[in-house]
Amino acid sequence: MXXXRKSHPLIKIINHSFIDLPTPSNISSWWNFGSLLGVCLGIQIITGLFLAMHYTADTSTAFSSVTHICRDVNYGWLIRYTHANGASMFFIFLYFHIGRGIYYGSYTFMETWNIGVLLLFTVMATAFMGYVLPWGQMSFWGATVITNLLSAIPYIGPTLVEWIWGGFSVDKATLTRFFAFHFILPFIITAMVMIHLLFLHETGSNNPSGINSDSDKIPFHPYYTIKDILGLMMMILILSMLILFSPDLLGDPDNYTPANPLSTPPHIKPEWYFLFAYAILRSIPNKLGGVMALVLSILILALFPVLHMSKQRSMTFRPASQCLLWILVANLIILTWIGGQPVEYPFITIGQLASISYFSIILILMPMTSLVENKLLKW
């Protein structure tokens, strides 16, 4: 019976992925976020499924169906707020996970990293379409503004936008297709996650030192299963506090007003986790330039393996690069703040400066610092 774990075709795969997986003995809590993201994805799919049972993807009833879920469905409010705040947790963990990858040089696993970048784009697309579904003011105007950006694409832009809308404005057809895509994409994400793990297990995990750890591996279970459970408990605690004490903390009050194409909200802004990219988009006065900067702000992650100039993999023993990375983090926080502010004098300038520094830190300062560090170490 004990042999079934290693011989059964299906259980064998699970065994090699989560039980007998050789893992570096020194990986820190920064390596917990992968499993937490998996749990978040599971929570989102389950709560989303239950929401879909009561939601109607029609402009005339979408808003009231969400109200019905919160008021009349047993624990509907809990399912709805778990789904909404679960998305926020998902993005917090995603950004931590990416930050960990940058700090410890995990991007040298090219295949794993590139699938990860694709995953980020897919998750962002899914979250954006999910935000449109409650059909509140910010849902409608957010969808209008963001889809309209595609009209900046030369020649095919305007046609492409109308094709996505399914008409001449964001309307019933748009809502229906967004619901369809929002439902299917998490399953595509799950498949991509499996590929992500497949590539990761080809090379094995990275570790804080950035050097090969083949000589010092321990089994994943029980050492890291118990460590992941601790992270899971902390996540559940934070998420529960968010849902039960201040479920609307991260939301926008405008989304409690039903969508009205005739009145524009004073400040159109996306959910908090897109604000940094939104600030970069707004900081460029030209439409096409803004869209390109928006896409590049995420796509730039794919350049990290190319921009890696250091002879060391990890930043553990590189104080100057560490300093730059933390400046980049501060810069992203500033961009997030600016993205939520109105387009007025001080904010415009701050946003432009933060956008310039975002790209220059990644493209110029970090590679140059790495080269200087190599010189200092006589490499």
UniProtKB/Swiss-Prot annotation:
Keyword Heme: yes
Matches recorded under SUPFAM superfamilies: a domain/subunit of cytochrome bc1 complex (Ubiquinol-cytochrome c reductase), Transmembrane di-heme cytochromes
Necessary cofactors: heme b
Residue intervals passing through the bilayer: 33-53, 77-98, 113-133, 178-198, 226-246, 288-308, 320-340, 347-367
Coiled coil: none
Positions of a ubiquinone binding: 201
Cellular component GO terms held in the UniProt record: mitochondrial inner membrane; respiratory chain complex III
Subcellular location(s) per record: Mitochondrion inner membrane
Binding note for cofactor: Binds 2 heme b groups non-covalently.
Family matches, as InterPro entries: Cyt_b/b6_C, Cyt_b/b6_C_sf, Cyt_b/b6_N, Cytb/b6-like_sf, Cytochrome_b, Cytochrome_b_C_euk/bac, Cytochrome_b_N_euk/bac, Di-haem_cyt_TM
Chain positions recorded as heme b b566 binding sites: 97, 196
Annotated disulfide bonds: none
Signal peptide limits: none
Bilayer disposition of the protein: Multi-pass membrane protein
CDD domains: cytochrome_b_C, Cytochrome_b_N
Membrane found in the keyword field: yes
Keyword terms: Electron transport, Heme, Iron, Membrane, Metal-binding, Mitochondrion, Mitochondrion inner membrane, Respiratory chain, Transmembrane, Transmembrane helix, Transport, Ubiquinone
GO molecular function list: metal ion binding; ubiquinol-cytochrome-c reductase activity
Note: Heme 1 (or BL or b562) is low-potential and absorbs at about 562 nm, and heme 2 (or BH or b566) is high-potential and absorbs at about 566 nm.
Family annotation (PANTHER family): CYTOCHROME B
Assembly with partners or alone: The cytochrome bc1 complex contains 11 subunits: 3 respiratory subunits (MT-CYB, CYC1 and UQCRFS1), 2 core proteins (UQCRC1 and UQCRC2) and 6 low-molecular weight proteins (UQCRH/QCR6, UQCRB/QCR7, UQCRQ/QCR8, UQCR10/QCR9, UQCR11/QCR10 and a cleavage product of UQCRFS1). This cytochrome bc1 complex then forms a dimer.
General function of this protein: Component of the ubiquinol-cytochrome c reductase complex (complex III or cytochrome b-c1 complex) that is part of the mitochondrial respiratory chain. The b-c1 complex mediates electron transfer from ubiquinol to cytochrome c. Contributes to the generation of a proton gradient across the mitochondrial membrane that is then used for ATP synthesis.
Official protein name in the record: Cytochrome b
Record organism: Capromys pilorides
Gene name tied to this protein: MT-CYB
